[in-house]
Amino acid sequence: MELKTECLPAGVLGYKACKYKAKDWDSTKYRSEATNNDEWSGFYTGSTETLTFGYMPDCTDNQGNGTAYLNIVNITTAARIIVCQDERFKSPVQDKTALLNEIKEALRRIEIPVADSDLLIPTLARYRFYFKCYNNEDSNDMEIIIPNDLVDNVALQSYKQQIFINGVGQTLTKYVK
């Protein structure tokens, strides 16, 4: 597996499906409520609107009702990112444990000391890296995972909203703050 590191300039990063409007984003509150107890714990940002639309229903209540907000994600300062273009991530049936072990080994090869027992994304926070890979939806869309502990430089911008009634998404409309 090949990984490369890049520097992202401040500016638009992608899209985020949220239960809240952009004006209600609070990175301090998010960090206090977020858990870092999983390999992939983080703040997920879709590279395209199409990819992110798929997460809109996750923003509803248990009956499938509510309003989901598609916000534009900006970063306020430059950030370092690890890019993984391994196409095996595109498959939802791929053995993720094997991929995870390969990622950790590849990170060690580029001198980022991640132990096999370390949780991947939370550990990358210590070294101030985001992670980018393909989404597992058989597409060419990628997502950027910002470790929960690094969301201080995230700013959300109002973009679109969608009302859901009994799990059915209504017309997507633009919204302002």
Question: Where do the language-model regions lie?
Answer:
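Active-site nucleophilic cysteine motif
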Residues: S41-Y44
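Active-site and NAD+-binding cores of ADP-ribose-processing enzymes
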Residues: M1-E39, E49, M56, T60-K177
